[in-house]
Amino acid sequence: MNIWLSMLTTTGLGAIIGGFTNHLAIKMLFRPHRPIYIGKFQVPFTPGLIPKRRDELAVQLGKMVVEHLLTPEGIGKKLTNEEFQKGLIHWAQVEVDKVITNEQSLRHMLEKWDVAHVEKEATEKIEQVITEKIQSFLEEYYTYTWEQALPHSVHEKIENAIPNVSAFILKRAIHFFESEEGKSRLSKMIDDFFASRGTLLNLVGMFLGNVSVVDRVQPEVIKFLGQDGTKQLLTEVLQKEWEKLKGRDVKEVETFVEKEMIVSSILSAVKVEETVSKFLNQSVQQVCEPVRETIMEKVVPSAVTKGLKWGAENVASILNNLHLAEIVQQEVSTFSTERLEDLVLSITKNELKMITYLGALLGGMIGIVQGLLLLFLK
């Protein structure tokens, strides 16, 4: 009975000592948090291992993250993963669709994004671009003649239109002189002519009798205007003038209209400020609706794919610029010892318990061996 009691005692003591020793060793990894002194003498094993080596631990964790966890190869592989790309494209499409189907005005959206004075700046920028383009255009074309400046198709159209212009002018002239206003104007012209000739009017009056001069002249003028020869004559005159104009410099326009006036007239006609204001007052949905399908089906997938491709090709450079090791080191260095202990224990709690139990088991087994040795020695 004493033998079995001795074995039980040695086994129990061995288990208690083994379990307690392992438990104490685990605790000493974290405790005490600060060094303990007796006078000027620092008690050995204080502070605990992790508090004592926290800075080194932070450095090593940073290296471990960069060299073994967040490696360029691993991240690049993830970025080129087909399933990951599909998921990211779908997410991007959902988020972009929320924006482009928004019923708020474009002006309101820009203000919400803190983009101030966009209307004024856009108007000024557009007017500046238009002004620069017009001035550049005029500077170039002012070095040309009209023949050089106008396209060949315009030359053909003008030359083909001259006979029609002649016919139109003569038609309007006939219509004018057939009217009472035209007859009155013709009469005044005749009176002015004879007034400058003195007695010539009396001499003409003797030949015409009671018929007024204008009644005689009006039909002849209309007849003259309606003749083919008159049309041909006017056409030739217009063609000669057109030939003269083609040889003249475009720059001569500046003697009649200055550059600034041309620019100002075009800007007034374009109404940039009004156009920009109307555009900004439209809802985002109205602006984007014509291109919504293109954005969703082509632009977003293409942008995401190209972005991921670029990221995969430059991931090493990106990680180097991020200095992840330093970030991890700085973050770990800011952890309190208590937080670091809680973090490690939250991950390894079950394993550390098993180590304690293993110590008790080994201690118990050693106790049994000791009991057996004592038994044989007796």
Swiss-Prot record:
It comes from the Bacteria. It is found in: Cell membrane. The keyword Transferase does not apply. Pfam families: DUF445 (PF04286). Keywords: Cell membrane, Membrane, Transmembrane, Transmembrane helix. The chain crosses the membrane at residues 1-21, 357-377. Its main location: membrane. InterPro entries: DUF445, UCP032178. It is a multi-pass membrane protein. One of its GO terms (cellular component) is plasma membrane. Belongs to the UPF0754 family. This is UPF0754 membrane protein BCQ_0944. It comes from Bacillus cereus (strain Q1).
